[in-house]
């Protein structure tokens, strides 16, 4: 059945035609090749915005540094990073006056949270730069290699369990004259080949101890690894993003938590809330501005865009901000909060894989790794790259990294930078003129409302806001920001016109088949349609069309057309046979060639439950047989989570209900990784999995509380097994012989 996708817009009000301007269905663009060029671009741009600042050489790392704070004020409209510290502090003073006690309460809460945070908080997070192997690893692995390497240097803070002692270790590690650590080296072995003459060279990954000097270690700790941002739509050029190492992560966490406590209590902040809560906050802000508008006056809204938000901000401003916010806190906590900005103002960017060059005859290609970029004649590069390298030269270090003291990398201090933006919005007026401004800020995105008696005064207010932002190192783009009468604007991809416009086109890419398995995909598909009806104003006719489109897509994906259709194919043969032999054909799942009985009333019910009473008994028995080897009962209990990719923004986690049946299979992981040096990671993971299974066998409770106390897992398990054995022995469930054997085993482990 072919359906015209534009039927999706049958019953939608005209403003929602915005949905038709987001034709984001296909695959987004992914980057390939080297990201070095994009990273160098970022380094050059960041320094250009700060080039009139104070320049000096770092005593510790020997890197070229630039400090743009209190630099010359701009005379044109070009972006600049010259934030004036006294202006930043004054803006925060005003925020403190407007919200009495907010800073103290936020600091107190952040401090109390820090005291009870355990090291395992750092295992959350995706890729983390691992200083022992100089590449990205999953956060948990990077933390593990750091802790095991720290132990070699008598730094055992992590064993205490708290984040604070581990952070103390990090500070101590920066003072050690040299650091010993475990790294992975490949040893090449020549082996005679079995099936032919000659030799095979086998690479064997070995864990070896290595050591580096203090300066080398500090440089690694301050390094950010850079990659190219993938799946970014609507842009011709890709851009670079950065991953911090484990040394920086712990300190950033606390500062962000402090800023989050502040953002939660600022009505102008679009973080950390999202979804419908954010819409409510926005609607309140609009209503408030309209009600404050002078009689006969005018209210304008600027949909704002900031030029290079991250690259014009400066860690030194953030240092001043944390110092001001934590003014009444104990000195140790103030010091703790100041570490992240200090580390960031000395950061070093790794430049990635390097450039590819071809020989003059165009026959040979070679990759030039970053340390060697300047060791070959510049004329070997193309013009564009040559120009980049010339500008990069002053900030280049011989290890193939670049010093990057000004600017922040993407996504590092979202909350704290939001506080800075809100501070600018909170000033409201300059020099008691006839206008008032207010607005909303969410990381680098903002909306500005201005009330005044006429349009000219509104424009004056907007210009004053523009200049105020310049003093804080924020550059509002005059080209990309646009102004309307209040009641129509866009903020964080939410379009407002006398209320929020339904915009489910953002979700269109996620309407497809998720590709988990047949059972989960059906549940996810229906849940997404349900969520869009609840949250994004999708109407009933649209939803009905979406269901039909989804079912068609699902049948094509899994080759499971209806049993009475004319489609041929291997799977269809089996499905047709099942169709012929089934009485209750309505009871067959769509994946087994059954009809679709989903409609708007039953979207929330898993398909197996919906069709349960319509199934033939023998079909039901096969589908839901607990001993059926294809039924993954353990992994499919209760509520599941799936990753959903909307057109804008990060991947979202979504809960869905599914009932396990023969269609709930799980695929095995790709094992082609086995011969690489990642193999150690997998073996370690398997080891952890075995430990956790053992632990679960000893403590078979459904929910684990967060462990408190200083017991190791081994002690806890031995203790529990001793108790269990004694209870079993005393109640007669265990013979004396077995009891003594059990105790002897526990004795061998060293616990009795």
UniProtKB/Swiss-Prot annotation:
It holds the Pfam family Flu_PB1. RNA-dependent RNA polymerase which is responsible for replication and transcription of virus RNA segments. The transcription of viral mRNAs occurs by a unique mechanism called cap-snatching. 5' methylated caps of cellular mRNAs are cleaved after 10-13 nucleotides by PA. In turn, these short capped RNAs are used as primers by PB1 for transcription of viral mRNAs. During virus replication, PB1 initiates RNA synthesis and copy vRNA into complementary RNA (cRNA) which in turn serves as a template for the production of more vRNAs. Phosphorylated by host PRKCA. GO terms for cellular component: host cell cytoplasm; host cell nucleus. Disulfide bonds: none annotated. GO terms for molecular function: nucleotide binding; RNA binding; RNA-directed RNA polymerase activity. The gene is PB1. Its EC number is 2.7.7.48. This is RNA-directed RNA polymerase catalytic subunit.
């Amino acid at each position: 059945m072919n359906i015209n996708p534009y039927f999706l817009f049958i019953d939608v009000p005209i403003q929602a035609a915005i949905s038709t301007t987001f034709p984001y269905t296909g695959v987004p663009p992914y980057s390939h090749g080297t990201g070095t060029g994009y990273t160098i671009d970022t380094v050059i741009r960041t320094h250009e915005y700060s080039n009139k600042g104070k320049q000096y050489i770092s005593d510790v790392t020997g890197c070229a540094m630039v400090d743009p704070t209190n630099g010359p004020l701009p005379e044109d409209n070009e972006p600049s990073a010259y934030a004036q510290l006294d202006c930043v502090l004054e803006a925060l003073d005003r925020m403190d006056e407007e919200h009495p006690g907010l800073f103290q309460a936020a600091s107190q809460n952040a401090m109390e949270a820090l005291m009870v945070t355990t090291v395992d908080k750092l295992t959350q997070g995706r890729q983390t730069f691992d200083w022992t192997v100089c590449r990205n690893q999953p956060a948990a692995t990077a933390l593990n290699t750091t802790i095991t390497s720290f132990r070699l240097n008598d730094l055992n803070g992590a064993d205490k369990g708290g984040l604070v002692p581990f952070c103390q270790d990090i500070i101590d590690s920066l003072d050690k004259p040299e650091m010993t650590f475990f790294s992975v080296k490949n040893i090449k072995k020549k082996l005679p080949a079995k099936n032919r003459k000659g030799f095979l060279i086998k690479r064997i990954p070995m864990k070896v101890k290595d050591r580096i000097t203090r300066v080398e270690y500090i440089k690694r700790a301050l390094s950010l690894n850079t990659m190219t941002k993938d799946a970014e739509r609507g842009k011709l050029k890709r851009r670079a993003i950065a991953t911090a190492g484990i040394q920086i992560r712990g300190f950033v966490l606390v500062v962000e938590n402090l800023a989050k406590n502040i953002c939660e209590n600022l009505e102008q902040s679009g973080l950390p809330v999202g979804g419908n809560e954010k819409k409510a906050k926005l609607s309140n802000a609009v209503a408030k501005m309209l009600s404050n508008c002078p009689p006969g006056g005018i209210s304008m809204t600027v949909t704002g865009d900031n030029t290079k938000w991250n690259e014009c901000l400066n860690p030194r401003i953030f240092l001043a901000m944390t110092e001001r916010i934590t003014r009444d806190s104990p000195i140790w906590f103030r010091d703790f909060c100041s570490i992240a900005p200090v580390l960031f103002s000395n950061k070093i960017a790794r430049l990635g894989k390097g450039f590819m060059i071809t020989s003059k005859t165009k026959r040979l290609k070679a990759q030039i790794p970053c340390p060697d970029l300047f060791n070959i004649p510049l004329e070997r590069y193309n013009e564009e790259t040559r120009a980049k390298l010339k500008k990069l030269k002053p900030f280049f270090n011989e290890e193939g990294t670049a010093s990057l003291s000004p600017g922040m990398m993407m996504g590092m201090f979202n909350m704290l930078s939001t506080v800075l933006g809100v501070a600018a919005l909170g000033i409201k007026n300059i020099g008691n003129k006839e206008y008032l401004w207010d607005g909303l800020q969410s990381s680098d995105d903002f909306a500005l409302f201005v009330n005044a008696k006429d349009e000219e005064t509104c424009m004056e207010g907007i210009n004053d806001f523009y200049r105020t932002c310049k003093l804080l190192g924020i550059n509002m783009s005059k080209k990309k920001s646009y102004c309307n009468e209040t009641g129509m604007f866009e903020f964080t991809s939410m379009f407002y016109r006398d209320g929020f416009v339904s915009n489910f086109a953002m979700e269109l890419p996620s309407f497809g088949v998720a590709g988990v398995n047949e059972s989960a995909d059906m549940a996810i598909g229906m849940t997404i349609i349900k969520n869009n009806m609840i949250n994004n104003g999708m109407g009933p006719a649209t939803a009905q069309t979406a269901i039909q489109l989804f079912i068609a897509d699902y049948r094509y994906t899994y080759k499971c057309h209806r049993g009475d259709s004319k489609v041929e194919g291997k799977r269809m043969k089996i499905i047709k046979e099942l169709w012929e032999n089934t009485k209750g054909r309505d009871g067959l799942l769509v994946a087994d060639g059954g009809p679709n009985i989903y409609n708007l009333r039953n979207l929330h019910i898993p398909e197996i439950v919906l069709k349960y009473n319509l199934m033939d008994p023998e079909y039901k028995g096969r589908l839901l047989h607990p001993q059926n080897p294809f039924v993954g009962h353990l992994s499919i209990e209760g509520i599941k989570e799936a990753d959903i990719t909307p057109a804008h923004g990060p991947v979202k986690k979504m809960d869905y209900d599914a009932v396990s049946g023969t269609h709930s299979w799980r695929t095995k992981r790709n094992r082609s990784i086995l011969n690489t040096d990642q193999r150690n990671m997998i073996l370690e993971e398997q080891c952890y999995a075995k430990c956790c299974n053992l632990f679960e066998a000893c403590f078979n409770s459904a929910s684990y509380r967060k462990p408190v106390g200083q017991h190791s897992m081994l002690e806890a398990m031995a203790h529990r097994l001793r108790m269990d054995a004694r209870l079993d022995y005393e109640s007669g469930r265990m013979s004396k012989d077995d009891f003594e054997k059990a105790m002897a085993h526990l004795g061998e482990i060293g616990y009795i």
